[in-house]
Design a protein with these regions (language model features):
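RNA pseudouridine synthases
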Residues: 1-387
Length: 387
């Protein structure tokens, strides 16, 4: 039995998946754990399918057969060579352990695998766009993406994307082809989320980094401003994430035992309290589409200025006209969800050194936090007793 953990490519055309859902729309922030889902993953909170993810349950009466042949027979349009490459990269697991292509499947084995996305139907053309490269060597580059930039061409966003900017930046590197799935983006973050991303310049880097995301050995943390005064100083949010049946552009949290959606875990820690809002650090244990945004909405603390999840309403505070004016001013300072991918850590694919990066807040996020600091400094603690 093949479970529908495979996430169809939404990048170049709306497609109808097997549930009858239309996946068109601005959903750049697809699973950021490589969009590893990115079947079970980038992004981040992200971040779409850099990878296809499959889960296959072997029948109880299955005869022993090489796993590459078994999967090629079971999975339509997937070549045996492509499956062998996935095994060589460590992207095929049986019962939670990596196997090679000569492994022989056994009855009731649970097979999970990740396949590089196929070549794009639409060619990615370099565009001269300024990007903030915080680190670069012959294997990879780390970029601090600004809010408002889509990472990959998609419905309604065919120009001005991060990968097109990267293609221009690397135009003098003949071995880098933005249309080659063996190089390029390793994970993603949403259009209106700012922060750090790693780009692989070589197949070696793509495979090594992809494996780290797949095995959850990378480290990524986000800063977010959320509505409300969070009760606990730190905590863990667990709840399956799947598409909201009432709004296909939004994700919804389901009970972990419901069988709906995919397992998602977010860890948070309070950094600062502003009475009616809270600055938090979020660390992803998984990386589902809109994970932080959906989880925070689920526990009653949607991200500030997150229109999709209700964060553009005045959810906490005072009825005074001055407070309403203050909030509207905050909305203008940071006219997007207040979410920034602040840190990124991984092992370098060739030197094996630990690489850790920390980014400054972008100006809109910084001004927003300073505005709330000024607000709290001029407010008495009695104001917040009943919130």
């Amino acid at each position: 039995m093949i479970f529908l953990d495979y996430i169809y490519n939404k990048v170049y055309a709306p497609v109808e998946d097997d549930f009858g859902f239309d996946d068109a729309g601005d959903m750049d922030e697809l699973d950021d754990e490589l969009q590893v889902e990115e079947g079970n993953a980038a992004s981040g909170e992200g971040g779409d399918e850099l990878y296809e993810h499959w889960k296959v349950q072997v029948d109880a009466n299955q005869d022993p057969v090489r796993i590459d042949k078994y999967l090629a027979d079971k999975m339509a349009y997937q070549s045996r060579n492509r499956i062998q490459q996935a095994a060589d990269a460590g992207f095929i697991h049986v019962n939670g352990k990596p196997v090679k292509s000569n492994y022989k499947v056994r009855p009731n084995d649970l097979v999970t695998l990740m396949l590089d996305r196929p070549r794009h139907e639409t060619s990615i053309k370099p565009e001269e766009i300024a990007i903030n490269v915080v680190y670069e060597d012959d294997q990879l580059m780390v970029v601090n993406k600004e809010a408002g930039m889509v990472v990959h061409p998609g419905a309604g966003n065919f120009h001005g994307t991060l990968i097109q900017a990267v293609a221009w930046h690397l135009r003098d590197m003949p071995e880098f082809d933005a249309n080659d799935p063996e190089v390029g983006l390793v994970h993603r973050i949403d259009k209106d989320t700012s922060g750090l991303l790693v780009v692989a310049k070589t197949p070696t880097a793509k495979t090594a980094l992809g494996k780290q995301f797949f095995n959850k050995t990378t480290h990524r943390s986000y800063n977010a401003l959320v509505w409300g005064n969070m009760v606990e100083d730190e905590g863990r949010i667990e709840g399956n994430i799947g598409r909201d049946p009432k709004n296909r552009l939004r994700m919804k949290v389901f009970d972990p035992d419901s069988g709906i959606g995919k397992t998602a875990v977010t860890h948070y820690k309070v950094l600062e309290r502003f009475g009616y809002t809270t600055l938090v650090q979020c660390v992803l244990e998984t990386g589902r589409t809109h994970q932080i945004r959906a989880h925070m909405k689920h526990i009653g603390h949607p991200l500030f200025m997150d229109e999709t999840y209700g964060g553009t309403e005045i959810l906490r505070g005072q009825r005074s006209s001055s407070y309403k004016a203050f909030i509207q001013n905050c909305f203008k300072l940071c006219p997007r969800q207040a979410l920034h991918a602040k840190t990124l850590g991984f092992v370098h694919p060739t030197t094996r050194q630990q690489m850790d990066f920390d980014s400054e807040w972008p100006e809109d996020f910084r001004q927003l936090i300073e505005k709330w600091r000024g607000f709290i400094a001029g407010t008495t603690q009695d104001t917040f007793k009943n919130i």
